[in-house]
Each structure stands twice: as C-alpha cells, then as structure tokens.
C-alpha cells in the first residue's frame, strides 16, 4: 500500500509540473502558443485545442495568428469535432483570404459539414448545408486538387 501511495504521489508531482500544465496556468499567450504548437506537432490535438481555445480571442492581428488559427481548425478536424472544425475553417477562410492555405481550408470546412450528414432516413438539414458548402467550394475552385 505504501509503494502504491508513493508511486501515486510521484506521478502527480511529475505530471503537475509538465510544460503543458505550466502553459495552461500561464497568463503569457506566447508560452501558451509555443506549447500548443508543440502539442499539435506531437499529434496531441486535444491538448493543443485546450491551449488554442485560451489564446484565440486575444491572438488576432499577431504575426503568428494565421498559423495559429490554421492549426486550431486542423486540431478540431483531426479530433473529429466537425461542427467546430467547419466553423473554424470558414472563419479562417474569411479572415485570411490571401493565405496559401485558403483552398484547403475552404475544402475542409465544406467537408466538415458532409461528415455531419446523417443516414437518409433522418433529418437532412446537415446534408443540405454540406451540399451547399461543397457546391460553393466547387464554384470558387473549379480546378482544385481536392476535386477528383
């Protein structure tokens, strides 16, 4: 029992001092951004989302904002949170119309809505929205690499 308690206390001490935990508690958005990027690159999308959600409101206009909002949108996509992914990709596309990632963001935003489409016997509001979004994408990017 003592070994278990000791192991438990050591694990708490180790995990409570992790860079991720420090970033979560930090007031510095640069620390949060750096850690969120690291978590994203390590494919720990849930962790990166927690940090991106904290810094997103204050991050507009900063030099790294385009990259941050792209990773934020992608993290939602990769965690299969398609409602949020669709919204964030649309927001990215409208906020950064000259981005080199605009076509991909527009496509993934539209595709997010298609992932929400239920089976044919259920209400097809999401399906109709997906069709509209995909048609808008096709109209905007008729020669896209994503069509095919």
Model-assigned labels for residue ranges:
Residues 4-6, 13-148:
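Acidic, polar-rich low-complexity tracts and alpha-helical solenoid repeat scaffolds
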């Amino acid at each position: 029992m003592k070994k278990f308690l000791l192991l438990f206390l050591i694990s708490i001490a180790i995990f409570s001092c992790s860079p991720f935990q420090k970033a979560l508690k930090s007031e510095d958005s640069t620390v949060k951004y750096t850690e969120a990027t690291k978590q994203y690159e390590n494919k720990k999308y849930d962790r990166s989302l927690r940090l991106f959600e904290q810094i997103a409101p204050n991050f507009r206009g900063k030099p790294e904002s385009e990259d941050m909002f792209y990773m934020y949108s992608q993290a939602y996509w990769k965690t299969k949170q398609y409602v949020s992914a669709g919204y964030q990709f649309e927001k990215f596309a409208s906020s950064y119309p000259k981005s080199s990632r605009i076509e991909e963001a527009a496509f993934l935003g539209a595709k997010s809505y298609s992932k929400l489409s239920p089976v044919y016997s259920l209400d097809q509001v999401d399906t109709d929205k997906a069709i509209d979004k995909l048609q808008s994408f096709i109209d905007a990017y008729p020669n896209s690499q994503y069509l095919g």
